[in-house]
Amino acid sequence: MAEAATGFLEQLKSCIVWSWTYLWTVWFFIVLFLVYILRVPLKINDNLSTVSMFLNTLTPKFYVALTGTSSLISGLILIFEWWYFRKYGTSFIEQVSVSHLRPLLGGVDNNSNNSNSSNGDSDSNRQSVSECKVWRNPLNLFRGAEYNRYTWVTGREPLTYYDMNLSAQDHQTFFTCDSDHLRPADAIMQKAWRERNPQARISAAHEALEINEIRSRVEVPLIASSTIWEIKLLPKCATAYILLAEEEATTIAEAEKLFKQALKAGDGCYRRSQQLQHHGSQYEAQHRRDTNVLVYIKRRLAMCARRLGRTREAVKMMRDLMKEFPLLSMFNIHENLLEALLELQAYADVQAVLAKYDDISLPKSATICYTAALLKARAVSDKFSPEAASRRGLSTAEMNAVEAIHRAVEFNPHVPKYLLEMKSLILPPEHILKRGDSEAIAYAFFHLAHWKRVEGALNLLHCTWEGTFRMIPYPLEKGHLFYPYPICTETADRELLPSFHEVSVYPKKELPFFILFTAGLCSFTAMLALLTHQFPELMGVFAKAMIDIFCSAEFRDWNCKSIVMRVEDELEIPPASQSQHFQN
């Protein structure tokens, strides 16, 4: 009984839905009936005659003005559409049509779609969020010794405010803790990391170091008749040395000296906090801060050694650091190690590092993907020839190299243009967006020399990298080896990269058809209005001639013959059969 009642209710509901779907036809006939009934009270016939009389009295100048006004409005719409497309990457009218008009006109219900596809899209949404995350550049330069020198020479600012603000947030996260207010020097540095003015930050760092040089006297009564004053030094402030090395030092050698002083102070603080970390949450947070400071100092010292040409020393320091702190993956020290090993041409060691970090469970980067492609290209690039490959086909090793290049290009399609020097390089930012133009600049800035060193590697890349796009015709919707390409990269890269750099956009955005159609229609109507206003008689003769041509019998016969000939060409009918066909 219950099942019968449920079935009846479902049928009743479907009938109501069906009736509402076609109810507009009933309303249409009702309106027509009301107009017919009320034609006399509303004086519809008189109004129609008045309108026809008004239209008959209009002059050609009115139509010219009307055409010009419509052209002006179309031009304004075109300008607005073009501005909206340049700013947001989509057509305003198309977006309104899809988002608002389509549901009103019987489009697909968004709720049902979301409920059906929520499970399938959850992973891709999480991946999209993670790929749109901004990461700290593991190969970032030194502000004082490198970025500021570029500004002095060119007068351009290589870093954006957004990028420097992210660095300030990183410094506050890595180098501060809740107990800093208990130590005067750390309290000063906590404020220094928030300063926007570089000179104010440097002055605060010097002030923090001066406070640590004040000696505290502790009175110790050793003999009853005398008093001995013991002089005790406060511990040095490691973060102050870090700030001075990053921003005040004008050369890498000066920065290295300051980092060595920071290492002495940071190592002492780390050992003391390591012994007290289990005494409470406050000591644990302080030990975590001291660990971050020590790792940062050692990593920057290794980078100084790499800059100064002591590459083997830098490799040893990086390996020791990765062994001592294996869980601190936020600094991505393995990418610094890969670059240094490539400089030494230790390709076997590079392969060993890739075997550990090029794992499906670990986040990818341009350094990982393109270094793997470089190693596979190195095995075949010296003998690779496009002509020979087209004749005999690709060997197994060449196929592996091409697949590795396609994998790397799919992950970050902006890198090949910089490696092939199709776009000019700039100084890399302090933060990068994975799969974006900022990551491509950061990778190519340091790895272009390694690709040039391998004979034929750039030639192989030049011949094969564009083939990736045939495998992923719709990269924003579906990828091949990775998730679909995130659509947020362009906006984030414009915030990270300086204004004088032309941001690389992938995939290339084509103008929507509506904008092109509006532009053509606007231009055509404006031209007709101008010609009609200047030469009214000539345009009238031309319009009459065109109407006569289109309405003539010869034009209709020619159009029919052209259609028949086109159909016969598509069907490939032989000449004999064609003549027989026309005879029949």
Swiss-Prot record:
One Pfam family recorded for the sequence: ST7
Signal sequence region: none
Domain of life of the source: Eukaryota
Phosphoserine carried by residues: S385
CC terms in the record's Gene Ontology section: membrane
InterPro entries for the chain: ST7 (IPR007311)
Compartments in which it is found: Membrane
Membrane topology: Multi-pass membrane protein
Annotated transmembrane regions: 15-35, 62-82, 511-531
Keyword Acyltransferase (UniProt): no
Keyword check for NADP: no
Cited PANTHER family: SUPPRESSION OF TUMORIGENICITY 7, SUPPRESSOR OF TUMORIGENICITY 7 PROTEIN
Protein name per Swiss-Prot or TrEMBL: Suppressor of tumorigenicity 7 protein
